[in-house]
Design a protein with these regions (language model features):
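An N-terminal assembly and electron-transfer interface module characteristic of large anaerobic redox
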Residues: 1-113
Length: 113
Protein backbone atom coordinates (compact mmCIF):
# COMPACT_ATOMS: atom_id res chain seq x y z
CA UNK A 1 0.00 0.00 0.00
CA UNK A 2 1.26 3.45 -0.89
CA UNK A 3 1.69 6.07 1.76
CA UNK A 4 -0.03 9.43 1.72
CA UNK A 5 3.34 11.08 1.10
CA UNK A 6 3.94 8.93 -2.00
CA UNK A 7 0.50 9.79 -3.36
CA UNK A 8 1.02 13.50 -2.72
CA UNK A 9 4.43 13.34 -4.42
CA UNK A 10 2.81 11.72 -7.47
CA UNK A 11 0.17 14.47 -7.59
CA UNK A 12 2.92 17.09 -7.30
CA UNK A 13 4.88 15.52 -10.17
CA UNK A 14 1.78 15.63 -12.38
CA UNK A 15 1.01 19.23 -11.40
CA UNK A 16 4.62 20.25 -12.04
CA UNK A 17 4.69 18.64 -15.49
CA UNK A 18 1.22 18.04 -16.94
CA UNK A 19 2.69 17.57 -20.44
CA UNK A 20 4.62 14.49 -19.23
CA UNK A 21 1.50 13.08 -17.60
CA UNK A 22 -0.40 13.56 -20.85
CA UNK A 23 2.37 11.93 -22.90
CA UNK A 24 2.61 9.00 -20.46
CA UNK A 25 -1.15 8.47 -20.67
CA UNK A 26 -1.01 8.43 -24.47
CA UNK A 27 1.82 5.86 -24.43
CA UNK A 28 -0.07 3.64 -21.98
CA UNK A 29 -3.51 3.78 -23.60
CA UNK A 30 -2.98 4.83 -27.20
CA UNK A 31 -5.45 7.65 -26.67
CA UNK A 32 -4.66 11.25 -25.94
CA UNK A 33 -6.08 14.06 -23.90
CA UNK A 34 -9.12 16.26 -24.30
CA UNK A 35 -9.00 19.83 -23.04
CA UNK A 36 -11.95 20.88 -20.93
CA UNK A 37 -12.79 24.50 -20.38
CA UNK A 38 -14.11 25.61 -17.01
CA UNK A 39 -16.79 24.75 -15.82
CA UNK A 40 -19.62 22.29 -16.39
CA UNK A 41 -17.73 19.92 -18.64
CA UNK A 42 -18.84 16.29 -18.38
CA UNK A 43 -15.45 14.82 -17.44
CA UNK A 44 -17.07 11.40 -17.00
CA UNK A 45 -17.89 11.30 -20.71
CA UNK A 46 -14.25 12.04 -21.57
CA UNK A 47 -13.12 9.25 -19.22
CA UNK A 48 -15.74 6.86 -20.63
CA UNK A 49 -14.38 7.49 -24.14
CA UNK A 50 -10.93 6.50 -22.88
CA UNK A 51 -9.36 9.96 -23.02
CA UNK A 52 -7.65 11.95 -20.30
CA UNK A 53 -9.50 15.17 -19.40
CA UNK A 54 -7.15 18.13 -19.01
CA UNK A 55 -8.51 21.17 -17.21
CA UNK A 56 -7.72 24.38 -19.05
CA UNK A 57 -7.49 27.08 -16.42
CA UNK A 58 -4.67 29.08 -17.98
CA UNK A 59 -1.42 29.89 -16.23
CA UNK A 60 0.19 32.71 -14.38
CA UNK A 61 1.54 34.41 -17.46
CA UNK A 62 3.09 37.77 -16.88
CA UNK A 63 2.38 39.05 -20.39
CA UNK A 64 -0.89 38.68 -22.30
CA UNK A 65 -0.53 40.14 -25.77
CA UNK A 66 -1.73 37.89 -28.61
CA UNK A 67 -4.99 36.98 -26.88
CA UNK A 68 -6.09 40.61 -26.84
CA UNK A 69 -6.52 40.39 -30.62
CA UNK A 70 -9.32 37.85 -30.18
CA UNK A 71 -10.88 38.66 -26.83
CA UNK A 72 -12.74 41.74 -25.60
CA UNK A 73 -11.09 43.85 -22.89
CA UNK A 74 -13.55 42.62 -20.26
CA UNK A 75 -12.55 38.95 -20.72
CA UNK A 76 -11.41 37.40 -17.46
CA UNK A 77 -7.77 36.59 -16.81
CA UNK A 78 -8.43 32.83 -17.05
CA UNK A 79 -9.78 33.08 -20.58
CA UNK A 80 -7.07 35.53 -21.64
CA UNK A 81 -4.42 33.16 -20.32
CA UNK A 82 -6.00 30.09 -21.97
CA UNK A 83 -6.18 31.90 -25.31
CA UNK A 84 -2.58 33.12 -24.99
CA UNK A 85 -1.39 29.57 -24.30
CA UNK A 86 -3.39 28.25 -27.26
CA UNK A 87 -1.87 30.86 -29.56
CA UNK A 88 1.59 29.81 -28.34
CA UNK A 89 0.86 26.18 -29.26
CA UNK A 90 0.72 24.81 -25.72
CA UNK A 91 -2.53 22.95 -26.43
CA UNK A 92 -1.61 21.66 -29.91
CA UNK A 93 -1.33 18.03 -28.75
CA UNK A 94 -4.89 17.84 -27.43
CA UNK A 95 -7.22 15.59 -29.41
CA UNK A 96 -10.17 17.92 -28.82
CA UNK A 97 -11.39 20.75 -26.61
CA UNK A 98 -14.83 20.85 -24.99
CA UNK A 99 -16.34 24.27 -24.41
CA UNK A 100 -19.22 25.06 -22.12
CA UNK A 101 -20.79 28.50 -22.29
CA UNK A 102 -21.49 29.79 -18.78
CA UNK A 103 -20.10 33.24 -19.61
CA UNK A 104 -19.96 35.66 -22.55
CA UNK A 105 -16.24 35.08 -23.12
CA UNK A 106 -16.58 31.31 -23.41
CA UNK A 107 -19.28 31.75 -26.03
CA UNK A 108 -16.70 33.03 -28.50
CA UNK A 109 -13.61 31.06 -27.43
CA UNK A 110 -14.20 28.24 -29.92
CA UNK A 111 -14.20 30.67 -32.86
CA UNK A 112 -10.40 30.91 -32.79
CA UNK A 113 -9.80 27.25 -32.07
Amino acid sequence: MRTAKEIINEFKAIADNPRKAMDDYKKETGKGAVGIMPVYCPEEIVHAAGYLPIGMWGAQKKQISKARTYLPPFACSIMQSVMELQLEGVYDDLEAVIFSVPCDTLKCMSQKW
